[in-house]
Amino acid sequence: MVVTKLATQRPKLPSVGRLGLVDPPAGERLAQLGWDRHEDQAHVDLLWSLSRAPDADAALRALIRLSENPDTGWDELNAALLRERSLRGRLFSVLGSSLALGDHLVAHPQSWKLLRGKVTLPSHDQLQRSFVECVEESEGMPGSLVHRLRTQYRDYVLMLAALDLAATVEDEPVLPFTVVAARLADAADAALAAALRVAEASVCGEHPPPRLAVIAMGKCGARELNYVSDVDVIFVAERSDPRNARVASEMMRVASAAFFEVDAALRPEGRNGELVRTLESHIAYYQRWAKTWEFQALLKARPVVGDAELGERYLTALMPMVWRACEREDFVVEVQAMRRRVEQLVPADVRGRELKLGSGGLRDVEFAVQLLQLVHARSDESLRVASTVDALAALGEGGYIGREDAANMTASYEFLRLLEHRLQLQRLKRTHLLPDPEDEEAVRWLARAAHIRPDGRNDAAGVLREELKKQNVRVSKLHTKLFYQPLLESIGPTGLEIAHGMTLEAAGRRLAALGYEGPQTALKHMSALVNQSGRRGRVQSVLLPRLLDWMSYAPDPDGGLLAYRRLSEALATESWYLATLRDKPAVAKRLMHVLGTSAYVPDLLMRAPRVIQQYEDGPAGPKLLETEPAAVARALIASASRYPDPERAIAGARTLRRRELARIGSADLLGLLEVSEVCRALTSVWVAVLQAALDVMIRASLPDDDRAPAAIAVIGMGRLGGAELGYGSDADVMFVCEPATGVDDARAVKWSTSIAERVRALLGTPSVDPPLELDANLRPEGRNGPLVRTLGSYAAYYEQWAQPWEIQALLRAHAVAGDAELGQRFLRMVDKTRYPPDGVSADSVREIRRIKARIESERLPRGADPNTHTKLGRGGLADIEWTVQLLQLQHAHQVPALHNTSTLQSLDVIAAADLVPAADVELLRQAWLTATRARNALVLVRGKPTDQLPGPGRQLNAVAVAAGWRNDDGGEFLDNYLRVTRRAKAVVRKVFGS
């Protein structure tokens, strides 16, 4: 008879699948340990404990290895695991979290006993004594010393990791991150003490060792160390002694072999500096040479081993300099450089996985906290603490950041540091890189090791992904708020609760540290923005922290903030404006860059604000590039044609031109356009305005019979003719007319002249927009000649009287507006003059060379620097353009492709025809592009035409950024400009034969 067991009598042992074991041999391994045969509660509890290990399969594999080692005492360990819940929690969590500690246990199988019972970590002093005793006990056994020290250090890490991880498996106390980090620093101190003892014995023998103090820096100095980290140190000596460097070097060698890498690169002069300096030498260096980052590093300095009294003297001497660092002349520039360097360190392909250097990562928190300490600890000693968590608490308590923000930032920081610890424990390797999000197994392991559990909607891996997103976003937002929110509160409405720390003086210091040269003025602008009545003030209070942060990265935050205030006041009634900045961060960030770089574009945006809405990206890319210059030109001409009144027509044309200039300038500043595209777009809009003005003036000036007495064409000269206008270029033109049938030349010229004069006057009317000046001085006889000539008059003049400079000027002549057929006939007529069948005469070439030499000596403005004048300076625009034009005059009769008004296109032809070596042509091209970018950038930055690059300083930095230089280092930009133009000048001299 078959007896069916009751459900309560069925085997209690969970299956391999229920335990989460996925390795195919998992069942065999359980059988090998004998854990699959006993159905008592102890074995059930044991198996469920194993299942909770972060990686149960890894833990099981390590247990098999332990069981196979005869030195383990497996029977004792097995019995203990069945009886002792705390041992299970510690051992299984370690084996499931750390392959490296599993290897350590297998190599030292008796070390599992360190995890039994009531585990108490030794104190700092006990730990140091035990490591030093290990050294003393090993005297006479030098071969085993490093091994014994490494084993002792790993045993301590094993104990600490077991206590840290146990709560992931059993209901054990959670060890706070700050305690773990401090205990790791204690171990590092003890390890350094042991290494120093070994080094002193090795170098000094029986003689007294030199007085050395070892100063821990970085995370070790702040007692917030990682499981795996380089330990940064600085060595200080009482006096010069040849043994100092030998002891220090030996100490680093021993420590690196037994424990961890020891790095002394934070010492004065870095790796190029002396390894050991006297205290006096340290003081002299920090007084004269130290950079801001070196003072920032000293925030974490802590004497750890060696001569304690000397270490304290080191701190006493140097820390006052740290608290005065924000007063240094280069403080702001160096802080800005440090902020950018942090962002540029991370390769783009792993930026989203970087715990330390990625956006919203650990370095964001640490940098923000340290900068606030440097700014405010000068006057508040409560901020003079080393650890990031302690500093956040002190900043919150002192009112320098909101208390809730301090608590949230601390929570995010500790969460990210916890993940960093878990990642490093796995193989005891230094890493800050999260697993690939697609690696489900690795993400699940990390989640379990960090004690993250399913939440009902997501499994542990899903919860970790969501938590990481949340924490990164929170850190990014808080990173901005830490700097700016307390500033806004300090200037907010009366009665707002502000802690005592954030006085107006402290607020000014913080703004100065963030790059504002006029912090008190900046505070006034901020106050005006946030203290508006109603919704606008509230929205500005929410927006400003992030906007101010973005603006602080621009070359001129002060000018940017003023421009933002003016723009906000001008658009106060436009509801879309603040809504766009609030809802579209990309638009807001780009706008802050533009406002903080340019004086030219903000003025345009105030009267063409809808361009701001084009700062976002569309499906095909940036909306600023969706507009075609040709379409703008057609719309502008059509718009003007709707008005019979010339003034209203030109006002309409100005409106569209203003919008187009704002679009071009914005796209240029944001790096969306090449310089040649900028020049073509600027030329296109100028030509459209000219065509619109000519059309409307002709319509308004028709006689009663509505028949124009003459056809009129406008010939573009100079950069207008070459379609290479810059923001500050003149528009050089000539007017040509042809009488209508039955109209004599005199009447046609008189009528056409009145049209030309009225067009010039109408366009030249003073306006808040960039000027629309027409320059007709390149016409025959210059200012003394008639403004308008007939085609026949031009032909007669050029045939009889054309001077070499006039022939040269005609090389850029191009029909740009008016009667197209007349314009083309004019060009065919002047082709005989500018491209004569036999080339220009040798006398003409000599005359052009003479004129160029005279221009170089006479036309450069008084006081201008010939090396940095973009137009007339060495290797500048005039040099390149005159060189191209000389080659056109000499060779255009043989090379038809040189019948071209564009400098860049003509350079291509010169290279293709091998008139000048290709390498030399490339030097000319780069100089023209560099000078054109610089000249355009000067107008964008200063808001008015200018050709002279400024000297070193904020304005040159802004020009560098506006010109598309890779950073805001004006010095680098200027060096490149000088190098490029110097090389081009050598080519110019070769071509001109001088």
Curated annotation (Swiss-Prot):
Keywords: ATP-binding, Magnesium, Multifunctional enzyme, Nucleotide-binding, Nucleotidyltransferase, Transferase
InterPro entries xref list: GlnE, GlnE_rpt_dom, NT_sf, PII_UdlTrfase/GS_AdlTrfase
GO molecular function: [glutamate-ammonia-ligase] adenylyltransferase activity; [glutamine synthetase]-adenylyl-L-tyrosine phosphorylase activity; ATP binding; magnesium ion binding
A Gene Ontology BP annotation from the UniProt entry: regulation of glutamine family amino acid metabolic process
Reaction it catalyzes: [glutamine synthetase]-O(4)-(5'-adenylyl)-L-tyrosine + phosphate = [glutamine synthetase]-L-tyrosine + ADP; [glutamine synthetase]-L-tyrosine + ATP = [glutamine synthetase]-O(4)-(5'-adenylyl)-L-tyrosine + diphosphate
UniProt region (Adenylyl removase), positions on chain: 1-487
Cofactor(s) demanded: Mg(2+)
SUPFAM superfamilies for this protein: Nucleotidyltransferase (SSF81301), Nucleotidyltransferase substrate binding subunit/domain (SSF81593)
GO cellular component: cytosol
CDD domains referenced in this protein's UniProt entry, alphabetically: NT_GlnE_GlnD_like (cd05401)
Sequence segments annotated as region (Adenylyl transferase): 492-994
EC number from the UniProt entry: 2.7.7.89, 2.7.7.42
Function according to Swiss-Prot or TrEMBL: Involved in the regulation of glutamine synthetase GlnA, a key enzyme in the process to assimilate ammonia. When cellular nitrogen levels are high, the C-terminal adenylyl transferase (AT) inactivates GlnA by covalent transfer of an adenylyl group from ATP to specific tyrosine residue of GlnA, thus reducing its activity. Conversely, when nitrogen levels are low, the N-terminal adenylyl removase (AR) activates GlnA by removing the adenylyl group by phosphorolysis, increasing its activity.
Similarity field: Belongs to the GlnE family.
Protein name (Swiss-Prot/TrEMBL): Bifunctional glutamine synthetase adenylyltransferase/adenylyl-removing enzyme
Gene coding for it: glnE
